[in-house]
Every structure is written in C-alpha cells, then in structure tokens.
C-alpha cells in the first residue's frame, strides 16, 4: 500500500505547555489533528473554568493563520475541587477532568492525595456528562516504578469504575498488559489512550547501551511483553483503545541533565509513527478507527468530516527543533527514518 486516506484524526491526550512554548506546540499539533484534549498540568494548574477559558484563548491565539484546530479543555482535580467547580467548568465547555495522583508526573504536586474524598465530585461529573481522565499510577515511595500502573488498577480504578458505572473513564497512556486486560473486560464506559512511544519502545530502549533521556516518559516504558500486549490491543481494532500521543515537550537541557524531565515530544511525527506501527502489525485497516473514530465516539463528539492522506515516503525526523525562545528541543525519534509522510 502506497497511500492511506483517513478521516482527520484527533489527539485525545497531549501537553501544550504555555506562553511562548505554544508558538511551537500548537502549530505542530494543528498540522495533523483537528482537535486535542489539552492537559491541565500548568504552573499554576488549570483548576477552574476561568483558568481553562483563559488557557484556551492563549492556545487559539497560537494557531497558524487559517487553522480550524480546536482545543478541548480539561480541569485539574485537587482535594479542594468542588461540585460547583465541575458545574461551572461544564458550563464553560470543559469536556473532562484529569485525576493525577500527587507526584505522578510533571507539575502534579497539587494533585490528589486521597481519591475517595473526590467521590462526590465523580458523582457530579457522571451527572454532568464530564469524562474522568486518569493518570493511573500509585506514587507511594516504596512501590516499584514498574508496578505503579498495575497497583493503581487494583487499589483504585476497580473501585472507581464499580462505584460510578455511568461515569465515562479514560485510563490514559496505558503501558501494561494489566491495563489492556482491565479496559477490555470493563463496561463500554471505560476506554484507554495509547502513545506512540509505548507501541514502538520498551524499557530496553531506555536503558540498554546507556540511558536515553529522550525516551524517558511517565508512565515509564515497560518490558517487551507489555509492549506486545499494547500492540496486540490496537491491532484488534477494539473501539476501547484510541490515539493519545501524550506529546510532552521539554527543552533539551531539561531532558539531558542529572535529573531529567519525563516526556516525549512527538507532535511532529505522531500520526506517521502510528502508521508505521500499524503497518508492522499488518493492521493498517485499523488505523482510521484508532486515530479518527474511537475517541470521538467515546467522547460523544461528531467525527471529523475532512480527511488527511499519508503517503509511503521515507523522511528523517529532525535531530533538533529550535523553540521560539531560541532553546533547542529534541523531538521523539530524532534522527530516525519514518516510512510514512503526511501529504501536504
């Protein structure tokens, strides 16, 4: 196959950051995607409707001229989030709220320390039709980092799903066979996003032959058996799994340091890399559902009407991109050859 035409895809999980970084990240995503679920872990975090609306305005201002890209805003849940916050956010057009266990990812220190305390908020979200997006890891210091996702499912996610069967839940950026099995066995109100890095890589790609900081993300890459479970899941074409890049930019100096930041900046190549994975799996016929249909259907939003075309054409991802502030950023898969290209 030399060409694939798809309904224009959406990215159901990414990080734009803020301020002048938006001048890089927003055009990178708008190049391919019609809509994106924008994570709220700024400093300070996006904890209410007013902050979400202001952030949306900053994103819209960074769109390329003529772009129809639409940011879909989210709320950052904290222990002080109230039912009124949820109602106001829904009224302002916020589509989802994000649950971060405290310390689980970049800028999550303000996040939730006692999940059961938020049950009244979850009940209101179900009532309002607002989705719950979950970074599914426990963060206690004694827990092995490779076991965080499995234990979160066992200790918290089962309880949330059983307690609130009408609440739509997305387990974000899943990394384990445990997550695949849980989502597959759960009701139609439970789904998951999967990143390109977790389909393409496993922990050997992070640690063998030297530490590779630009492959470091959270949740951390797992062993090959978990990677294969993710690949098998997307190859089935199940509507429970859909595209969420978790594209997360950090300046080169923040990644290449004694305590490097987590995140892979994949916006410039994500769809092409997903296509490469689906081709390897002999499942290119399943790519459109994963990239363009399943997420919109789960969110209860209309599918996009425009199309994009990928052509079989080799190109090399740049070694570095210069940010608006002049600092370099290393994109995901920098310097590597990709077999599919987005047709202009």
Curated annotation (Swiss-Prot):
Its cofactor is Zn(2+). It catalyses: (S)-dihydroorotate + H2O = N-carbamoyl-L-aspartate + H(+). Zn(2+) 2 binds at residues 98, 135, 173. It is an enzyme of class 3 (hydrolase). The modification N6-carboxylysine is found at residue 98. Zn(2+) 1 binds at residues 13, 15, 98, 246. CDD domains: DHOase. Binds 2 Zn(2+) ions per subunit. It comes from the Bacteria. One of its GO terms (molecular function) is zinc ion binding. The active site is at residue 246. SUPFAM superfamilies: Metallo-dependent hydrolases (SSF51556). Belongs to the metallo-dependent hydrolases superfamily. DHOase family. Class II DHOase subfamily. Catalyzes the reversible cyclization of carbamoyl aspartate to dihydroorotate. PANTHER family: DIHYDROOROTASE. This is Dihydroorotase.
